[in-house]
Regions:
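Acidic, glycine-rich A-domain
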Residues: 1-280
Protein backbone atom coordinates (compact mmCIF):
# COMPACT_ATOMS: atom_id res chain seq x y z
CA UNK A 1 0.00 0.00 0.00
CA UNK A 2 2.86 2.41 0.73
CA UNK A 3 4.00 2.29 -2.91
CA UNK A 4 0.44 3.04 -4.00
CA UNK A 5 0.20 6.02 -1.64
CA UNK A 6 3.58 7.30 -2.87
CA UNK A 7 2.47 7.15 -6.51
CA UNK A 8 -0.81 8.82 -5.59
CA UNK A 9 1.01 11.77 -4.03
CA UNK A 10 3.18 12.00 -7.15
CA UNK A 11 0.08 12.24 -9.34
CA UNK A 12 -0.89 15.48 -7.57
CA UNK A 13 1.23 17.27 -10.18
CA UNK A 14 0.33 17.13 -13.86
CA UNK A 15 2.10 18.31 -17.00
CA UNK A 16 0.22 20.81 -19.13
CA UNK A 17 1.00 22.02 -22.64
CA UNK A 18 1.79 25.75 -22.54
CA UNK A 19 2.40 27.85 -25.65
CA UNK A 20 4.93 30.68 -25.31
CA UNK A 21 5.63 33.34 -27.91
CA UNK A 22 8.77 35.34 -28.73
CA UNK A 23 10.93 32.20 -28.80
CA UNK A 24 14.12 31.59 -30.83
CA UNK A 25 12.65 28.43 -32.41
CA UNK A 26 9.24 27.02 -33.19
CA UNK A 27 6.32 28.11 -35.35
CA UNK A 28 6.54 31.56 -36.97
CA UNK A 29 4.36 34.19 -35.28
CA UNK A 30 3.45 36.76 -37.96
CA UNK A 31 2.57 39.49 -35.45
CA UNK A 32 5.92 39.09 -33.69
CA UNK A 33 7.68 39.19 -37.07
CA UNK A 34 5.96 42.47 -38.01
CA UNK A 35 6.74 43.95 -34.60
CA UNK A 36 10.39 42.86 -34.88
CA UNK A 37 10.79 43.58 -38.62
CA UNK A 38 13.83 45.92 -38.20
CA UNK A 39 15.56 43.16 -36.23
CA UNK A 40 14.66 40.69 -38.97
CA UNK A 41 16.26 42.91 -41.66
CA UNK A 42 19.40 43.22 -39.53
CA UNK A 43 19.51 39.46 -38.96
CA UNK A 44 19.07 38.85 -42.68
CA UNK A 45 22.05 41.10 -43.45
CA UNK A 46 24.25 39.32 -40.91
CA UNK A 47 22.93 35.86 -41.70
CA UNK A 48 22.39 35.35 -37.97
CA UNK A 49 18.85 34.54 -36.87
CA UNK A 50 19.75 33.06 -33.46
CA UNK A 51 18.60 36.07 -31.45
CA UNK A 52 15.49 36.70 -33.55
CA UNK A 53 12.58 35.72 -31.27
CA UNK A 54 9.58 35.64 -33.57
CA UNK A 55 8.40 32.07 -33.00
CA UNK A 56 5.80 30.29 -30.86
CA UNK A 57 6.80 27.11 -29.07
CA UNK A 58 4.97 24.62 -26.87
CA UNK A 59 6.44 23.57 -23.51
CA UNK A 60 5.37 20.97 -20.95
CA UNK A 61 5.11 22.56 -17.52
CA UNK A 62 4.42 20.89 -14.17
CA UNK A 63 1.27 22.26 -12.59
CA UNK A 64 -0.30 21.44 -9.24
CA UNK A 65 -3.78 19.96 -9.43
CA UNK A 66 -6.49 21.67 -7.41
CA UNK A 67 -6.98 19.18 -4.60
CA UNK A 68 -9.68 19.32 -1.90
CA UNK A 69 -8.92 20.95 1.44
CA UNK A 70 -10.53 18.11 3.35
CA UNK A 71 -11.45 14.44 2.90
CA UNK A 72 -13.77 12.81 5.45
CA UNK A 73 -14.13 9.02 5.49
CA UNK A 74 -16.80 7.35 7.64
CA UNK A 75 -16.94 3.62 8.42
CA UNK A 76 -20.26 2.10 9.52
CA UNK A 77 -19.96 -1.37 11.04
CA UNK A 78 -22.88 -3.76 11.55
CA UNK A 79 -22.89 -4.80 15.21
CA UNK A 80 -26.28 -6.52 15.17
CA UNK A 81 -27.07 -9.90 16.73
CA UNK A 82 -26.67 -11.79 13.45
CA UNK A 83 -22.95 -10.99 13.23
CA UNK A 84 -21.35 -14.35 14.13
CA UNK A 85 -17.71 -14.98 15.12
CA UNK A 86 -16.49 -15.48 11.53
CA UNK A 87 -18.04 -12.19 10.37
CA UNK A 88 -16.78 -10.32 13.46
CA UNK A 89 -13.22 -11.61 12.96
CA UNK A 90 -13.26 -10.67 9.25
CA UNK A 91 -14.60 -7.21 10.11
CA UNK A 92 -11.95 -6.66 12.81
CA UNK A 93 -9.20 -7.66 10.39
CA UNK A 94 -10.58 -5.41 7.65
CA UNK A 95 -11.10 -2.43 9.92
CA UNK A 96 -7.58 -2.80 11.29
CA UNK A 97 -5.96 -2.96 7.86
CA UNK A 98 -8.04 -0.14 6.38
CA UNK A 99 -7.87 2.38 9.23
CA UNK A 100 -4.14 1.91 9.75
CA UNK A 101 -3.47 2.09 6.02
CA UNK A 102 -5.38 5.37 5.76
CA UNK A 103 -3.48 6.63 8.79
CA UNK A 104 -0.19 5.79 7.00
CA UNK A 105 -1.39 7.64 3.91
CA UNK A 106 -2.36 10.66 5.99
CA UNK A 107 1.07 10.78 7.65
CA UNK A 108 2.73 10.45 4.25
CA UNK A 109 0.45 13.16 2.86
CA UNK A 110 1.39 15.62 5.61
CA UNK A 111 5.10 14.80 5.31
CA UNK A 112 5.06 15.48 1.56
CA UNK A 113 2.71 18.47 1.54
CA UNK A 114 5.22 20.46 -0.51
CA UNK A 115 4.80 18.03 -3.42
CA UNK A 116 1.11 18.86 -3.66
CA UNK A 117 1.75 22.49 -2.65
CA UNK A 118 -1.52 22.22 -0.71
CA UNK A 119 -2.44 21.11 2.78
CA UNK A 120 -5.06 18.37 2.75
CA UNK A 121 -6.85 17.26 5.90
CA UNK A 122 -7.76 13.55 5.80
CA UNK A 123 -9.86 12.35 8.73
CA UNK A 124 -11.81 9.20 9.61
CA UNK A 125 -14.63 8.25 11.96
CA UNK A 126 -16.15 4.89 12.95
CA UNK A 127 -19.77 4.09 13.79
CA UNK A 128 -21.38 0.88 15.05
CA UNK A 129 -25.04 0.23 14.36
CA UNK A 130 -27.64 -2.38 15.22
CA UNK A 131 -30.85 -1.70 17.13
CA UNK A 132 -29.08 1.47 18.26
CA UNK A 133 -25.97 3.26 16.98
CA UNK A 134 -22.97 5.03 18.46
CA UNK A 135 -19.69 6.54 17.36
CA UNK A 136 -16.41 5.06 18.64
CA UNK A 137 -13.99 7.29 16.73
CA UNK A 138 -14.47 10.97 15.88
CA UNK A 139 -13.03 12.99 13.00
CA UNK A 140 -11.30 15.19 15.59
CA UNK A 141 -9.21 12.37 17.10
CA UNK A 142 -5.53 12.95 16.28
CA UNK A 143 -2.06 11.50 16.90
CA UNK A 144 -1.82 9.06 19.85
CA UNK A 145 -5.49 9.50 20.73
CA UNK A 146 -6.40 8.54 17.16
CA UNK A 147 -4.30 5.39 17.41
CA UNK A 148 -6.05 4.44 20.65
CA UNK A 149 -9.46 5.05 19.09
CA UNK A 150 -8.51 2.89 16.10
CA UNK A 151 -7.75 0.04 18.49
CA UNK A 152 -11.01 0.77 20.32
CA UNK A 153 -12.92 0.61 17.03
CA UNK A 154 -11.57 -2.87 16.40
CA UNK A 155 -12.12 -4.38 19.85
CA UNK A 156 -15.70 -3.15 20.23
CA UNK A 157 -17.11 -5.24 17.38
CA UNK A 158 -19.10 -7.76 19.43
CA UNK A 159 -22.59 -8.26 17.90
CA UNK A 160 -24.62 -6.90 20.83
CA UNK A 161 -26.92 -4.42 19.13
CA UNK A 162 -29.97 -6.48 18.05
CA UNK A 163 -31.59 -5.52 14.72
CA UNK A 164 -30.00 -3.86 11.67
CA UNK A 165 -30.92 -0.17 11.72
CA UNK A 166 -28.27 1.51 9.57
CA UNK A 167 -30.67 4.29 8.55
CA UNK A 168 -30.37 6.05 11.92
CA UNK A 169 -26.58 6.39 11.81
CA UNK A 170 -26.66 7.42 8.13
CA UNK A 171 -29.31 10.00 8.97
CA UNK A 172 -27.15 11.41 11.77
CA UNK A 173 -24.19 11.70 9.39
CA UNK A 174 -26.40 13.47 6.85
CA UNK A 175 -27.72 15.91 9.47
CA UNK A 176 -24.13 16.72 10.41
CA UNK A 177 -23.41 18.07 6.92
CA UNK A 178 -23.86 21.85 7.10
CA UNK A 179 -25.04 24.01 4.19
CA UNK A 180 -21.51 25.35 3.86
CA UNK A 181 -20.06 21.83 3.71
CA UNK A 182 -22.65 20.81 1.11
CA UNK A 183 -21.47 23.71 -1.03
CA UNK A 184 -17.82 22.73 -0.48
CA UNK A 185 -18.61 19.14 -1.51
CA UNK A 186 -20.49 20.29 -4.64
CA UNK A 187 -17.50 22.44 -5.62
CA UNK A 188 -15.08 19.56 -4.89
CA UNK A 189 -13.29 21.55 -2.19
CA UNK A 190 -14.23 18.78 0.23
CA UNK A 191 -14.96 15.08 -0.23
CA UNK A 192 -17.08 12.90 2.02
CA UNK A 193 -16.99 9.12 1.65
CA UNK A 194 -18.97 6.49 3.59
CA UNK A 195 -18.27 2.74 3.72
CA UNK A 196 -20.67 0.33 5.39
CA UNK A 197 -20.03 -3.31 6.30
CA UNK A 198 -23.16 -5.37 7.02
CA UNK A 199 -24.18 -9.03 7.04
CA UNK A 200 -27.62 -8.49 5.57
CA UNK A 201 -30.26 -6.10 4.43
CA UNK A 202 -31.54 -3.31 6.63
CA UNK A 203 -34.47 -3.97 8.94
CA UNK A 204 -35.96 -0.70 7.62
CA UNK A 205 -35.11 -0.76 3.88
CA UNK A 206 -37.33 2.17 2.91
CA UNK A 207 -35.72 4.49 5.47
CA UNK A 208 -32.21 3.38 4.48
CA UNK A 209 -32.94 3.80 0.76
CA UNK A 210 -34.24 7.35 1.35
CA UNK A 211 -31.19 8.51 3.32
CA UNK A 212 -28.76 6.81 0.90
CA UNK A 213 -30.47 8.67 -1.93
CA UNK A 214 -30.17 12.00 -0.06
CA UNK A 215 -26.47 11.43 0.60
CA UNK A 216 -25.83 10.59 -3.07
CA UNK A 217 -27.74 13.71 -4.15
CA UNK A 218 -25.40 15.70 -1.88
CA UNK A 219 -22.44 14.22 -3.83
CA UNK A 220 -21.36 12.05 -0.92
CA UNK A 221 -19.73 8.82 -2.11
CA UNK A 222 -21.32 5.92 -0.25
CA UNK A 223 -20.84 2.15 -0.52
CA UNK A 224 -21.95 -0.97 1.34
CA UNK A 225 -20.36 -4.42 1.43
CA UNK A 226 -22.48 -7.40 2.48
CA UNK A 227 -20.82 -10.44 4.09
CA UNK A 228 -22.13 -13.89 5.06
CA UNK A 229 -24.85 -16.19 3.78
CA UNK A 230 -27.78 -14.18 2.47
CA UNK A 231 -31.32 -15.20 1.48
CA UNK A 232 -32.96 -14.35 -1.85
CA UNK A 233 -35.28 -11.89 -0.11
CA UNK A 234 -32.39 -10.13 1.65
CA UNK A 235 -30.42 -10.07 -1.62
CA UNK A 236 -33.34 -8.36 -3.33
CA UNK A 237 -33.69 -5.90 -0.43
CA UNK A 238 -29.96 -5.13 -0.37
CA UNK A 239 -29.95 -4.44 -4.11
CA UNK A 240 -33.07 -2.28 -3.76
CA UNK A 241 -31.32 -0.12 -1.15
CA UNK A 242 -27.86 0.14 -2.68
CA UNK A 243 -28.04 -0.57 -6.40
CA UNK A 244 -31.49 -0.12 -7.94
CA UNK A 245 -32.20 3.16 -9.79
CA UNK A 246 -28.77 4.67 -9.19
CA UNK A 247 -26.36 5.81 -11.90
CA UNK A 248 -23.89 3.15 -10.77
CA UNK A 249 -24.02 0.40 -8.08
CA UNK A 250 -23.16 1.29 -4.49
CA UNK A 251 -23.48 -2.18 -2.96
CA UNK A 252 -21.33 -5.30 -3.20
CA UNK A 253 -22.54 -8.74 -2.09
CA UNK A 254 -19.74 -11.06 -0.99
CA UNK A 255 -22.02 -13.63 0.67
CA UNK A 256 -19.85 -16.61 1.72
CA UNK A 257 -16.66 -15.08 0.27
CA UNK A 258 -16.01 -13.32 3.58
CA UNK A 259 -12.24 -13.64 3.15
CA UNK A 260 -12.48 -11.09 0.30
CA UNK A 261 -13.76 -8.35 2.62
CA UNK A 262 -10.38 -6.72 3.34
CA UNK A 263 -9.45 -6.72 -0.34
CA UNK A 264 -12.79 -5.24 -1.44
CA UNK A 265 -12.88 -2.47 1.15
CA UNK A 266 -9.28 -1.40 0.55
CA UNK A 267 -9.95 -1.52 -3.21
CA UNK A 268 -12.91 0.85 -2.77
CA UNK A 269 -10.86 3.19 -0.56
CA UNK A 270 -7.99 3.23 -3.07
CA UNK A 271 -10.33 3.78 -6.02
CA UNK A 272 -12.05 6.74 -4.38
CA UNK A 273 -8.84 8.43 -3.26
CA UNK A 274 -7.30 7.80 -6.68
CA UNK A 275 -10.24 9.48 -8.40
CA UNK A 276 -9.78 12.54 -6.17
CA UNK A 277 -6.08 12.89 -6.96
CA UNK A 278 -6.27 11.96 -10.65
CA UNK A 279 -9.43 13.85 -11.64
CA UNK A 280 -8.79 17.10 -9.76
Amino acid sequence: MKNFWRKLIGSAKKEVNVEKNRQAKGKLNVNDLIYSYPDFIEAEKNGNYKNLKVFDKNFLEAKNKMLPKKIEISFLIDNSGSMDEEKIEATRKTLTATLLSIRDFNLYLQAHAQKTNQKIELVTETWFFGQDHYKVKNFEDVKDLEKNKIVSSITKVNNNLGTTDDASSLREIYKGISSKQKSQIKNKKEYKIIFEITDGASTFPGATKDIVKKLIETDVEIYAIQIGKISKIDTKTFNYIWNDNFRYPHGIILADDIEKLTYELIRLVKRNLQSIFNDS
